[in-house]
Amino acid sequence: MGNGSVKPKHSKHPDGQSGNLSNEALRSKVAELEREVKRKDAELQEREYHLKELREQLAKQTVAIAELTEELQSKCIQLNKLQDVIHVQGGSPLQASPDKVPLDVHRKTSGLVSLHSRRGAKAGVSAEPTSRTYDLNKPPEFSFEKARVRKDSSEKKLITDALNKNQFLKRLDPQQIKDMVECMYGRNYQQGSYIVKQGEPGNHIFVLAEGRLEVFQGEKLLSSIPMWTTFGELAILYNCTRTASVKAITNVKTWALDREVFQNIMRRTAQARDEEYRNFLRSVSLLKNLPEDKLTKIIDCLEVEYYDKGDYIIREGEEGSTFFILAKGKVKVTQSTEGHDQPQLIKTLQKGEYFGEKALISDDVRSANIIAEENDVACLVIDRETFNQTVGTFDELQKYLEGYVATLNRDDEKRHAKRSMSSWKLSKALSLEMIQLKEKVARFSSTSPFQNLEIIATLGVGGFGRVELVKVKNENIAFAMKCIRKKHIVDTKQQEHVYSEKRILEELCSPFIVKLYRTFKDNKYVYMLLEACLGGELWSILRDRGSFDEPTSKFCVACVTEAFDYLHRLGIIYRDLKPENLILDADGYLKLVDFGFAKKIGSGQKTWTFCGTPEYVAPEVILNKGHDFSVDFWSLGILVYELLTGNPPFSGIDQMMTYNLILKGIEKMDFPRKITRRPEDLIRRLCRQNPTERLGNLKNGINDIKKHRWLNGFNWEGLKARSLPSPLRRELSGPIDHSYFDKYPPEKGVPPDEMSGWDKDF
C-alpha cells in the first residue's frame, strides 16, 4: 500500500491449533477404541460360542453319566439275576436270552437250585409296631417333656444345622427337626471305643460334636466323619444291622437320639397337625358333617401359603376358586361401600376362621378384600379342582350325606347281579371248601401239628423261619405250614405283626389271597397252616424271564387290584406288595401271601409303623407322616414298573440311598423304552408323591385303576369268575408237586425255647 503499511499474515491461534489437534487425537482414540471394542466383541462372541459348546458338552456328559449310572445299576441287578439263572441251570452257559427262558425251566432243573438263587430277592423291614399289645416288655407311654434335654442356644443351632445338612432329615418338617434337637442327649466315648459296630443292630442316630471318628468296613478304612455331621440315620427308621463300624480315634462327644423317641416325635407332630386341621374343617358349615375319611383326604390336600403385612390374599371383584383357613396371624376384611373412595374395614379375622368357602361350590366373585395384618400370616389352602377330584363335587357330597349313594349302590347291585352270578357262585364254592378243610384240621392237636402232618419239602426260608409243604398223613391233602421262630419274633419286637397276620387271615376268603386254615404253637414256634399254592413264586418266574410282556403284566396287576379291592373294603392295608409275595395256584392265578405287615385301620384313620420293602415303600412311610390305603396304590405302581422291566424304579447301593431316590420322586424320571406310553401313565399316576393325588385314592376309588386306558378291554368278570386263562399257568402232577420251587438245605440247629407267654392266645 502507498502509505507503506503491511497486511498481516493470517495465523492460527495457538488455542485453535490445540483444539484441532485435540479433536484429531480424540477421533483417532475413538477409532482405536472402536477397533478394540470390535476385537473384544469378536473375542467375547468366540468365548461365548466356546462356552456354549462346553455347556452343551457338559449337558451331554451329565445325561451320559446319568444314563451310565442307571445302566450300571440295572446291569448290577441284572447280573445278580443272570448269575441266579446260571445257578438254576447248574452252571451251564445260557442258551436263551433272559426274556425267552421257558416257564418250565424251574421244573426241569429245580434239583440243582441252591440258596444262591435267592440272592436277588428283596426283604421286608419293620420298626416296632406302635401298638405293642403282646410285647410284655413294652416301654411306658412317651412323654415329650420327660424326653427333653437341656442345651444352650448355640448347641441347638449347631445340632439343627447338622440335621438339616442330612439328605434324608432335611425333608422333615421344621417342627419335627426342632423336637428332635430338644430330645437329643449327650453320649461320650473313649478313644478306641466303637460308637457303631458292624453287624450289630442299630437303635440311634448321632451328631458328632467333638473329637475324631473314622468309618471302617471290616479292617478297611472308608472315611472319617467331620464335626457336626449326622450319621446312623437308618437306625431311627427301623431295627437294622449296621453295615459299617464307627470308631473313636480320640475322645469323642456326640448327641444321640433313640429310634423310639424319634418315631414318637414324628407321630406326635403329625397327629397334632392333623387334629388341628380337622378341628378347623369341622368349624366350616359346608364341611362339618362330612365323614372322617373325606375329612382326612381334605386334610392331606391342604397346602400352607404365607403372606406378609399388606399382602392381598383375596381382591374384591376377582374370580376365585380357592378356599382359605387362617392357621396363623390376623387378616383384615375391607369392602367398597357407597359414599367412600377407599374400601372400608368390615372386620378382622384370626386363627381358625375361614373365607372363600363358596369357591368350593362354583366360581366365586370375591365380595371383599382380605389383607394380611402382620408378617408371616399362614393360610391353609385348597382349590376347587383338587377338592372335586379328591372327595367329589359339593353336589356329590350332598347326595352322599343324604344317603343317595347307598340307594344308587343297591340299584347298581341289582343291575349287575346277573352278570356277577358266576363270581358269586365261585365265592360260595370257595367258602364251602374252606369250611370243610377247617373242620378237618380243627381235630389236630394244637401243640403237636406234626402228629397229623408230614413234611414233604421246604417251599421257602426267611429271617422268621421256614415254609414247609406238608400233607395230611395217609391222605392226599396238602398245605403250606409257615413255621415262625418265637425267639426271633420277641427279639425283633414283632409280636403285634404276627398276631395281626393271624387275625386278618382268619377273616379273609378271596380267590386272590392265600387262605389260613389253622394255627398251632409249641415252645419254639408258632405255626400257620396255609393253602398250598404250588405254581411257584412270581419272583422266580420274573427272575428267570428277565421281564414280562404287557399281557402277562396286565394279568398280574389285575389279580393284585382285585385283592386290594377286597382288602380295602374290609379296612385292611397290605403294605408289603412285591413279586416275592405273589404266588401262583394250580390255575396260574396270583394270590397275595405274607400278611405280616397288613393292618386293619378305621375309616379316615392313619397308621405310623415303618414297614414294607425298601424299594416299594411310599414317601409318607419314609417321612413318618402317617399312611393309609394309598401306600398300596404306590406299591402297585412300583410293581407295574418291575414286571415290565425286571427291576424296581428306585434301587440304590444301600437302603438310605433307595429312600432318598424315592423322596426325589418319579415325576422327572426317564422311563426305559420297553415301558410304553399307557403303562407309563398308569405308573406315574399311581406313584404321585402326594397320597391324595394317587390313582385309586381319588373320589372314584379303585375303579379309576380298573378303568385306566392301559387296562381297557381287560376281562375283569372273567378274572373274578376264574374263567380267564392265565398266561402263567403251569402243569402240576398232583397236590404235592413242588418242582417249581427252589431247593433249600435242611435247617441248621434247633431254635431255643421261648416261654414268655406272649403267644398264649395264638
UniProtKB/Swiss-Prot annotation:
Enzyme Commission designation: 2.7.11.12
Keywords recorded for this protein, A-Z: ATP-binding, Cell membrane, cGMP, cGMP-binding, Kinase, Lipoprotein, Membrane, Myristate, Nucleotide-binding, Phosphoprotein, Serine/threonine-protein kinase, Transferase
Tissue localization of expression: Highly expressed in intestinal mucosa and is 20 times less abundant in brain and kidney. Expressed in jejunum, in the apical domain of the villus epithelium.
One Pfam family hit: cNMP_binding
Region (cGMP-binding, high affinity): 168-283, 286-416
Binding site for ATP: L459, G460, V461, G462, G463, F464, G465, R466, V467, K482
Domain AGC-kinase C-terminal, residue spans: 712-762
Protein name (Swiss-Prot/TrEMBL): cGMP-dependent protein kinase 2
Organism expressing this protein natively: Rattus norvegicus
